[in-house]
Curated annotation (Swiss-Prot):
It catalyses: GTP + H2O = GDP + phosphate + H(+). This is Elongation factor 4. GO terms for cellular component: plasma membrane. Required for accurate and efficient protein synthesis under certain stress conditions. May act as a fidelity factor of the translation reaction, by catalyzing a one-codon backward translocation of tRNAs on improperly translocated ribosomes. Back-translocation proceeds from a post-translocation (POST) complex to a pre-translocation (PRE) complex, thus giving elongation factor G a second chance to translocate the tRNAs correctly. Binds to ribosomes in a GTP-dependent manner. It comes from Coxiella burnetii (strain Dugway 5J108-111). Residues 7-189 form the tr-type G domain. GTP binds at residues 19-24, 136-139.
Length: 602
């Protein structure tokens, strides 16, 4: 295949909220440009993971190169990079945008603009991309394009009166959209003769090929067989295979400035080609690496432990392979008295945490226990030291703590006026402080400062149910703020269970302690002795319940006769139970750890 001239290349991605029809539109592009034969077409071609198809969401960014014949008679090479729409995967979006010159802003003509779309769209505009508004689902009876166009102009602030109206499901106006895309989005710039600079947008591990990297060539030309250098590690490799996806893998001889494609260089070390790094030639190397992406900080932390301790090594390898493919995942070894050895993992949000756990269990056949998720707190000790704690069991003694500061997030919410009351009530319940309230044409834009610990756990789900699915949310960490927080310990038979400890606000501690002990009472199986379940703040017990003992009928064999005989047997049983209570261990089932998560949801 001959190398196409740079002026006929267009690199673009699609910005859209979940369920606004982004993956369906991508399918139509592939069909229209003949990327796959009719037999190979299936719905959501680019959502390659089973989880993506089951949940109907896009998690990983994918890339496709399509050839499109325009009305002007020229063939254009369209490099389309698919992006996820959920707030937890926003870092994937910023990586995709770094490889593009333009973006399609796809908005559902019935639902209107959502908060997450606004945030991503601003990222695209900041990176200097041309944003092209598109109205999708125009075939729906409840579609109201005029209202949505007004909303795009009011909320995002870009011209939208000539937005293209398409129906991706029916394939209506998709060709017209591609025609306009070719005109509106500029071709890439970059000198093909300059020293090579290629930005790694994504990487994944293939058992046969090693690390496969998705790259965008910014300058220079990468040819098959070239000796290339990874700029951050300084290691050299040979480019064994290069090519692009159509969406099938198609080998090429070279990738020149402006192109998007994959490189296989026999890198067997999982961290050999980190995402956001720059590839260059080993001999004529570029002077400086390209600016990468901003490093994402994990917001939610949880302990992940294998149920079988023999699975620790496979679990560690699985995490390393997954981290290559998911740059936002963070992990470090951790041990727990209750659960043994495992890892403390950092995630971007609860959905990210669920997806990671599900991928580990499915793709690597592991059985895992997850502890209650927490956020990272800033602790100022009485000695004036500053500590960051993301694990309740690492919290210093209460006497040594000067001040605990919790992370505060700024949450932007868009909601129809009908549900405003319910959403405000929810924000107040979550200890939110209102900063801004703005009435737009058909929506209300609200800005709240809410503690991050309240946002990440179940705020998104509660917001959706309070607004019947119409509200949308975008949040970001803002600052740390002093708060009256305490560590809530759970004791079972007088023993602290480190995996069940949580950090809560003092006002909520009593309620939370009572709910937790009640829930655990139902989940811990009855033993031959009474089991006390207590919630404590420091040395003060604030709630208690008991799991009553199972009792064998020891007097069943006595028929009539002397009462002292029965009494003797009962006393003997009582003494045995007392001894058992001192030495007996209680096995805590997996459900008990999950109870900590579910207490908040009810």
């Amino acid at each position: 295949m001959t190398t196409i001239s740079q002026k006929f290349i267009r690199n673009f991605s699609i910005i859209a909220h979940i369920d606004h029809g982004k993956s369906t539109l991508a399918d139509r592009f592939i069909q229209l440009c003949g990327g796959l034969s009719e037999r190979e077409m299936k719905a959501q071609v680019l959502d390659s993971m089973d989880i993506e198809r089951e949940r109907g969401i896009t998690i990983k960014a994918q890339s496709v190169t399509l050839n499109f014949k325009s009305q002007d008679g020229h063939f254009y090479q369209l490099n389309f990079i698919d992006t996820p729409g959920h707030v937890d995967f926003s870092y994937e979006v910023s990586r995709s945008l770094a490889a593009c010159e333009g973006a399609l802003l796809v908005v559902d003509a019935a639902q209107g603009v959502e908060a997450q779309t606004v945030a991503t769209c601003y990222t695209a505009i900041e990176q200097g991309l041309v944003v092209l508004p598109v109205l999708n689902k125009i075939d729906l009876p409840q579609a109201d394009p005029e209202r949505v166009i007004q909303e795009i102009e009011d909320v995002i602030g870009i011209e939208a009166h000539d937005a293209i109206r398409v129906s991706a499901k029916e394939g209506r106006c998709v060709k017209e959209l591609l025609e306009q895309l070719v005109v509106a989005i500029p071709p890439p710039v970059g000198d093909p003769e300059a020293p090579l600079q290629a930005l790694i947008i994504d990487s994944w591990f293939d058992s046969y090929l090693g690390v496969v990297s998705l790259v965008r060539v910014k300058a220079g030309t990468l040819r098959k067989g070239d000796k290339i250098r990874v700029m951050s590690t300084g290691k050299d490799y040979y480019a064994d295979q290069i090519g692009h996806f159509t969406p099938k893998r198609q080998p090429l001889e070279e990738l020149s400035a402006g192109a998007v494609g994959f490189v296989v260089a026999g890198i067997k070390d999982i961290f050999g080609a980190p995402v956001g790094d720059t590839l260059t030639h080993a001999k004529q190397s570029a002077g400086s690496p390209l600016p990468g992406f901003k490093q994402v900080k994990p917001q939610v932390f949880a302990g992940l432990f294998p149920i079988n301790s023999e699975e620790y090594e496979p679990f560690r390898e699985a995490l390393a392979k997954l981290q290559l493919n998911d740059a936002a995942l963070f992990y470090e070894p951790e041990s727990s008295e209750a659960l043994g050895f495992g890892f403390r993992c950092g995630f971007l949000g609860m959905l990210h945490m669920e997806i990671v756990q599900e991928r580990l269990e499915r793709e690597y056949n592991l059985e895992l226990i997850t502890t209650a998720p927490t956020v990272s707190y800033e602790i100022l000790t009485k000695q004036g030291e500053m500590l960051y704690v993301d694990n309740p069991s690492h919290l210093p003694e209460p006497g040594k703590i000067g001040e605990i500061r919790e992370p505060i997030a700024v949450a932007n919410i868009l909601v129809p006026p009908t549900y405003l009351g319910a959403v405000i009530t929810l924000c107040v319940e979550k200890r939110g402080v209102q900063k801004k309230l703005l009435y737009l044409s058909n929506q209300v834009s609200m800005t709240y400062e809410i503690p991050l610990s309240e946002v990440v756990l179940d705020f998104f789900d509660r917001l959706k149910s309070a607004s019947r699915g119409y509200a949308s949310l975008d949040y970001s960490f803002n600052h740390f703020q002093a708060a009256d927080l305490v560590k809530l310990d759970i004791l079972i038979s007088g023993q602290k269970v480190d995996a069940l400890a949580t950090i809560v606000h003092r006002d909520l501690a009593y309620t939370r302690g009572r709910e937790l002990t009640e829930r655990l009472k139902d989940l811990i199986p009855r033993q031959m002795f009474e089991v006390a379940i207590q919630a404590a703040i420091g040395a003060k017990i604030i709630a208690r319940t008991s799991v009553k003992a199972l009792r064998k009928n020891v007097t069943a064999k006595c028929y009539g006769g002397d009462i002292t005989r029965k009494r003797k047997l009962l006393e003997k049983q009582k003494a045995g139970k007392k001894r058992m209570k001192q030495v007996g261990k209680v096995a805590i089932p997996q459900e008990a750890f999950l109870a900590v998560l579910r207490v908040k949801n009810e």
